[in-house]
A protein has these predicted regions:
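Mobile genetic element proteins and their domesticated derivatives, centered on retroelements
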Residues: 13, 30, 43, 54, ...
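Short, conserved micro-motifs composed of acidic
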Residues: 58, 142-177
Length: 281
């Protein structure tokens, strides 16, 4: 982008990724990495011993075992899933089709089941998608095209003449805003993030707390709740995403409006004095 180029991004959504992970496919990948036999047998025993059932109203079905799927909240689940789809990452890196930074391939960025493809051209992005989809099909996984999206960043971000499609012909739309790992990337001539959704979530969190304790709790308690429950929502991602002066002023206004409500004032100077008094800096 800094060299007047345009970067093409595709955020892929995998359909029920953790639920579709094949146990035997995972065991093969673990054996390829030559993990200890005892550990492999332990994992196999865990998966074989796991039982599930279906509840409908007050009725329960018979328990049955599953040949695929892992718990999304499990401690080991993210690591096992990362190992399971590692072949997708390696295939893209070896192709050298995507973008590179100092000769290091960054054509694919993966965190758990959130996949981001990055390419210098639309044609290259289509090739990356085809490579990923072929490998994912081999892993018995599929892409949810309706929840996936493409985005362009750079001088030609408004110019898009070619649609990105999956192997079976489903179109992945070009959008002005793409959500990845909780952050909203915006189509622009420079790398930009939107904090509009963060501000909405902050207001929801603050109003939920203030409506419960605003009339009975002290300012110290409300401010502590604001620090713990609301500020992390508002400031999520600001340490890694670029924040311009306009966005910074907008975030400051959101916080100031909440503090005005807590201290029951419309004066910014009073809010500043109260923040210093309560060490809220």
């Amino acid at each position: 982008v800094s060299c007047n180029s345009t970067v093409n991004i595709c955020a892929l959504d995998l359909s029920k990724a953790f639920d579709k992970m094949n146990h035997y496919g995972l065991f093969i990948k673990l054996m390829d990495r030559q993990i200890p036999v005892q550990l492999l047998q332990l994992l196999e025993f865990w998966f074989r011993s796991g039982l599930t059932c279906v509840k409908w109203g007050d009725c329960f079905s018979a328990f049955y075992s599953q040949a695929r799927g892992i718990r999304q909240g499990g401690v080991l689940s993210p690591y096992l899933f990362a190992l399971y789809i590692d072949s997708v990452i390696e295939k893209v890196r070896r192709s050298r089709v995507g973008c590179e930074i100092k000769l290091e391939s960054v054509g694919i960025i993966v965190y758990a089941d959130d996949i981001l493809l990055v390419a210098p051209t639309v044609t290259a992005l289509q090739l990356l998608l085809k490579m990923c989809e072929n490998e994912l099909n081999w892993l018995a996984m599929s892409i949810n095209a309706s929840k996936s999206a493409c985005l362009r960043i750079g001088k030609d971000y408004k110019t898009v003449s070619v649609c990105i499609r999956t192997i079976d012909g489903r179109e992945i739309p070009w959008q002005d805003n793409v959500r990845y790992l909780g952050m909203h990337l915006v189509a622009n001539n420079v790398f930009t993030c939107s904090f509009d959704n963060a501000k909405k979530s902050y207001y929801r969190a603050f109003n939920a707390i203030y409506s419960k304790i605003g009339g009975i709790a002290s300012e110290e308690v409300i401010l502590e709740m604001l620090k713990m429950k609301c500020l992390p929502v508002l400031l999520y991602g600001t340490d890694v995403c670029p924040v311009n002066k306009k966005q910074l002023k907008s975030l400051e206004y959101v916080l100031t409006s909440s503090l005005m409500k807590i201290f029951r004032t419309q004066s910014g100077d009073v809010v500043d004095d109260c923040m210093k008094f309560f060490w809220f800096v």
